[in-house]
């Protein structure tokens, strides 16, 4: 990755300048965005996002199997419907219909069998998706992964479990949290204002979880030591792009396109893969941005070790 060397942004005066400077890129934000776009073309992020979309779609069905089996053990009513309602706020209608169809097809079967098969299938397919994401992040940083295949696969499985924990936490924030607060208001005399405040705060809390997950992914996945301070801009950018592009894509599919007429029975799968493509591309944009910022920071440090 070749970048021009520019001095630290930095005309922040006063004693707080050193504190603020470490959170600013060593090049201007306009330059960061321009170079990020160029790096995306050089690294063929458009093709890498298509690979990620394929693996994400491959992991969808076993993941739904696990959800179907686990939801049956939860002492809550209409959990799956509430989950779909939450997904529908950002996902296109065809994605929700596809998940609902899979749920209806397997929801009446052997719960234990689905849980066993689903977990095994989810581990394999989801770790394959995570492994593809690791390769994509290494490409973004222009580095070759010399680690043994079993080490990469083990890392992918560990990261997959971490993502699963984050998903469970997000679901708890969206679904179980409000019910727990309602129970607390009714039985413990908790101030209703707290419950109302949580209703407003739970989505920002989920967004924070997503940003933290991306931070960890950008920090652990590449075969390179990445300075923590330079991965947060990309994680924030990926989250913003994913939410914004998902909402835009959802509006387009719902109001301006008819994939069912164009693709027939596979229209839902096509829309789902396109949605995953948008999400994968958003992650790669953040990774490329981090790579641009860190490369500039390393080069500046080599040019001026004193940081003056």
Language model features with spans:
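Membrane-embedded alpha-helices and immediately adjacent juxtamembrane helical segments
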Residues: 1-308
């Amino acid at each position: 990755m070749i970048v021009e060397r520019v001095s630290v942004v930095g005309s922040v005066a006063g004693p707080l300048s050193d504190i603020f400077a470490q959170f600013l890129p060593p090049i201007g934000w306009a330059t960061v965005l321009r170079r990020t776009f160029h790096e995306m073309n050089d690294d063929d992020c458009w093709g890498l996002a298509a690979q990620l979309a394929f693996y994400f779609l491959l992991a969808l069905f076993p993941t739904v199997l696990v959800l179907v089996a686990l939801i049956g053990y939860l002492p809550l009513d209409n959990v799956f419907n509430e989950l779909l309602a939450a997904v529908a706020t950002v996902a296109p209608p065809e994605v929700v219909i596809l998940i609902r169809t899979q749920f209806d097809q397997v929801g009446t079967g052997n719960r234990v069998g689905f849980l066993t098969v689903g977990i095994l299938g989810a581990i394999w397919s989801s770790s394959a998706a995570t492994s593809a994401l690791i390769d994509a992040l290494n490409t973004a940083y222009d580095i070759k992964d010399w680690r043994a295949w079993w080490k990469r696969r083990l890392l992918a499985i560990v990261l997959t479990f971490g993502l699963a924990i984050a998903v469970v936490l997000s679901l708890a924030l969206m679904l179980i949290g409000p019910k727990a607060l309602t129970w607390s208001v009714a039985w413990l005399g908790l101030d209703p204002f707290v419950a109302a405040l949580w209703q407003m705060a739970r989505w920002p809390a989920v967004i924070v979880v997503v940003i933290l997950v991306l931070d960890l992914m950008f920090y652990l996945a590449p075969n390179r030591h990445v300075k923590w301070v330079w991965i947060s801009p990309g994680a924030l950018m990926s989250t913003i792009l994913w939410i914004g592009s998902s909402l835009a894509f959802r509006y387009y599919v719902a109001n301006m396109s008819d994939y069912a007429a164009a693709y027939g029975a596979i229209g839902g799968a096509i829309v789902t893969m396109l949605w995953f493509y948008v999400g994968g591309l958003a992650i790669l944009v953040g990774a490329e941005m981090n790579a641009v910022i860190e490369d500039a920071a390393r080069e500046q440090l080599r040019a001026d070790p004193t940081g003056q």
